[in-house]
Regions:
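SF2 helicase/translocase ATPase core recognition
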Residues: 320, 325-328, 333-370, 404-432, ...
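Inter-lobe coupling linker of SF2 helicases/translocases
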Residues: 291-297, 301-305, 328, 364-470, ...
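SF2 helicase/translocase NTPase motor core
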Residues: 230-324, 372-373, 479, 520-547, ...
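Walker B catalytic acidic pair
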Residues: 213, 314-315, 573
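Conserved pre-motif I regulatory segment
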Residues: 166-211
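Accessory nucleic-acid engagement/destabilization modules that flank
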Residues: 1-164
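Walker A/P-loop NTP-binding motif
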Residues: 196-204, 219-235, 329, 359-360
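Conserved Helicase C-terminal RecA-like lobe
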Residues: 230, 402-423, 428, 441-562, ...
Length: 638
């Protein structure tokens, strides 16, 4: 029996009905494959007047060339072929000897709307960052209204735009300044790659995030980049601005003197004997770079009036809360080139990524509101977002043996504890209070009541005396202190060193008393009240092989920027709310320069809030791993 094309089309479309009715349908393999699909193709590009050619390649500023056409199975159609297809109706259509799938009405509508949008965009032009969002169906908030993302429409870059994207991806060789012999001899191959990445991206007019794992030498790579700008004459007017946590000011200055002695760096902070002053126009040019803290940068209004040749944010997760005064102030600074250094660009949620990218590449992720709406739609993974931001983020892990073949192993061990009867009774009292608070109808008021209870629960897990505000820190009153005694006795017996982290400054002296008795000698402590000049002395003392056997540190004050590789054990006395902070603290010991295997002990009281926090942290680690996973095949330009 022979069928006409319309009869065959009707049969193929009705196969699901036959199968639901229990009829077995057997087809040749050729018919089992999905038929080619008719799609609208929009090509975006820059005209010659919107491009710049210089030593590091082609740069695109905005997009003004848009064309709308049609493809069939990925192959371009002529206007005549498209007209023939659309005139044959909808569904499965026989075309050039094969079946194709056509939704004629939808294709006509898409082409009409895109042609209208293309004429407007060609007339007005759109910023490059908006064009990048369009290519991945990213966050909306476009300056020109365009049709919503649709599976029947594909976006492609034109020749000039593709060349720029290939340069961003590192696919096209560009001119990168040679490193001075001193840096060339010191830097590892992956660090030279990081320097090239920073230079390549920033010379295109984009901001770059170096998101290497902690301990891979982000500071060294940034110093190499700054020194290249100095040698190119880019720092002869105003100096570059570096913003970093207070604990890293002296570290930056020492690293610059060590690796790039011709790069003059000054400190803008009250702790400096001769601080740099932005108001002093005569002395602005006395250095190539000035470093200050986030707090100083946010409250020094004179900085907002200056146009720096370059801005570096170290530990850039400090601006993660987009709505905070600090984050807004830092994002308002003017910098011709911008880079961010952060081993943890996302700690809790994707909104933190928006804040970071809004500093580096304003507008890339759309408005904050449109980005929040966009991320809620990412139910099947982060591929669209990953493709959009990946060209501007370079992330390497020190666990990659190709990068650091001699780094020892790190083993993470949960150290479970039980509450003592006294702790359990205090804990239950707070749980009863929590249940009563949950009946509060006002969400804001309820939250303000819940947070203090959660803090008290964590204090009880540490020791009843911390909750009660007394000095009776007898170990037998706390299951966690007894577990800590056992753990540190084993470390002391092996004559090894350990560092301990806690979020509670008040408990540090009592932990020190406990451990001094176990190790038979005093240790070191470092917290937010430790003067900045004294912090380096503490690190130097601990790093001596004959130095103190332990160091107790406050998590927020000492979790970044310190090198404590003499420790082969890291103990987290209590748990913080995001894994990135804990990981950063751990990496004070587990970093380049560590030659011993590192054991990470996390004290967890069973059946308490600490169990819940542990599960939550595992979920957050999975989110960050998913967002930054994958290789170059997931970049925007592919």
């Amino acid at each position: 029996m022979a069928w006409s094309a319309p009869e065959a089309r009707d049969f193929l479309q009705d196969i699901p009905l036959y199968e639901r009715a229990g009829i077995i349908v057997r087809m040749v393999n050729l018919w089992k494959n999905p038929p080619p699909k008719l799609q609208v193709k929009v090509t975006a590009d820059a005209s010659g007047s919107e491009t710049t050619v210089h030593s590091s390649g082609l740069s695109v500023r905005s997009l003004r060339k848009f064309s709308v056409s049609a493809t069939l199975g990925g192959k371009d159609l002529t206007p005549e072929e498209l007209g023939e297809l659309l005139s044959n109706g909808d569904g499965l259509i026989r075309f050039k000897g094969e079946w194709v799938r056509v939704d004629a009405r939808k294709v006509r509508d898409l082409m009409d709307r895109w042609n209208q949008a293309a004429r407007m965009m060609s007339s007005l032009g759109i910023p490059l960052v908006q064009g990048l969002r369009m290519l991945v169906n990213g966050p909306s908030g476009q300056l020109v209204q365009i049709p919503e993302p649709d599976e029947d429409c594909v976006m492609e870059p034109g020749q000039n735009l593709r060349q720029t994207l290939d340069i961003l991806a590192g696919k096209v060789p560009v001119s990168i300044p040679e490193l001075p012999s001193r840096l060339d001899a010191l830097m590892r191959p992956y660090q030279k790659e990081g320097f090239s990445f920073l230079y390549r991206i920033t010379e295109r007019g984009f901001g770059a995030c170096l998101a290497d794992d902690m301990g891979l030498g982000k500071t060294l790579q940034a110093i190499a980049w700054l020194d290249a700008l100095r040698r190119k004459g880019r720092l002869e007017g105003l100096p570059a601005l570096i913003v970093a946590p207070a604990s890293l000011l002296s570290n930056w200055k020492e690293e610059a003197q060590r690796f790039a002695p011709e790069l003059i760096l000054r400190i803008m902070h009250p702790s400096s004997p001769d601080p740099w002053q932005p108001e002093n126009t005569l002395r602005r040019k006395e250095c190539h770079a000035v470093i200050t803290t986030y707090a100083m940068a946010a409250r020094t209004s004179a900085l907002a009036d200056l146009h720096f040749p370059a801005i570096i944010l170290d530990e850039a997760q400090a601006i993660k809360n987009a709505g905070s005064a600090r984050s807004r102030a830092i994002r308002s600074l003017h910098g011709e080139r911008r880079i961010a250094l952060s081993g943890t660009p996302v700690e809790n949620n994707l909104n933190e990524l928006w804040s970071l990218m809004e500093f580096l590449n304003p507008g890339l992720l759309g408005s904050r509101k449109s980005f929040e709406s966009f991320t809620r739609s990412l139910e099947r993974g982060y591929a669209p977002l990953r493709r959009l931001v990946r060209p501007f983020i370079l992330r390497r892990m020190k666990t990659d043996p190709a990068l650091v073949p001699d780094l020892p192993d790190k083993t993470e061990i949960p150290a479970y504890c039980s509450l003592t009867p006294e702790q359990a009774a205090l804990y239950q009292t707070q749980i009863d209070m929590l249940h009563a608070v949950l009946d509060e109808p006002d969400p804001a008021a309820r939250l303000m009541l819940i947070l203090p209870i959660l803090a008290r629960l964590k204090q009880i897990c540490n020791h009843p005396a911390q909750f009660q505000g007394t000095d009776d820190y007898a170990p037998e009153r706390s299951g966690k202190f007894r577990r800590l005694q056992e753990l540190c006795a084993s470390i002391a017996a092996r004559q090894e060193k350990t560092i301990l982290f806690t979020q509670f400054r008040s408990i540090i002296p009592h932990l020190h008393d406990l451990l001094s008795g176990i190790f038979g000698r005093s240790g070191l402590t470092l917290h937010g009240g430790t003067p900045i000049p004294e912090r380096q002395n503490i690190v130097t003392a601990f790093q001596k092989e004959s130095g103190p056997p332990f160091c107790i540190l406050s998590l927020k004050a000492a979790g970044t920027g310190l090198t404590l590789t003499q420790a082969s054990h890291v103990i987290h006395v209590d748990r913080w709310w995001n894994p990135a902070v804990e990981n950063q603290a751990t990496d004070r010991a587990y970093r380049i320069g560590q030659h011993r295997n590192v054991l990470v002990h996390r004290l967890i009281c069973r059946g308490t809030i600490e169990d819940r926090i542990d599960a939550m942290l595992k979920d957050k680690r999975r989110m960050a791993d998913d967002l930054f996973s994958g290789g170059p095949e997931q970049w925007l330009m592919n």
